[in-house]
Amino acid sequence: MANVNIKPLEDRVLVQISEAETTTASGLVIPDSAKEKPQEGVVVAAGPGRFDGDDRVPMDIKEGDTVVFSKYGGTELKYNGEEYLLLNARDVLAIIEK
């Protein structure tokens, strides 16, 4: 997992995007123009949660979780040559348990 100096605020998470498949199961190479945008990644940083009155709502998502996120959610970032996505917690659809 990457060590980044980006700290998400409130209920946001920073996700390192998984690599898109470059070949099919039968060995055909998929060109960049035909690749699907990945919707899976690993949480490398998570905010403390949003405020509800004077209290913070705890986050269900934590650093190290592998998550599935909304296809069009978040803000793409490049940091130290790596691609990340900054998402609101509501854009995370599921946590993949291993």
From Swiss-Prot:
Listed GO biological process terms: chaperone cofactor-dependent protein refolding
Main location: cytoplasm
Quaternary state and interactors: Heptamer of 7 subunits arranged in a ring. Interacts with the chaperonin GroEL.
Keyword Chaperone: yes
Family named by the database record: Belongs to the GroES chaperonin family.
Keyword Cytoplasm: yes
Functional note: Together with the chaperonin GroEL, plays an essential role in assisting protein folding. The GroEL-GroES system forms a nano-cage that allows encapsulation of the non-native substrate proteins and provides a physical environment optimized to promote and accelerate protein folding. GroES binds to the apical surface of the GroEL ring, thereby capping the opening of the GroEL channel.
Protein name according to UniProt: Co-chaperonin GroES
Molecular function GO labels: ATP binding; metal ion binding; protein folding chaperone; protein-folding chaperone binding; unfolded protein binding
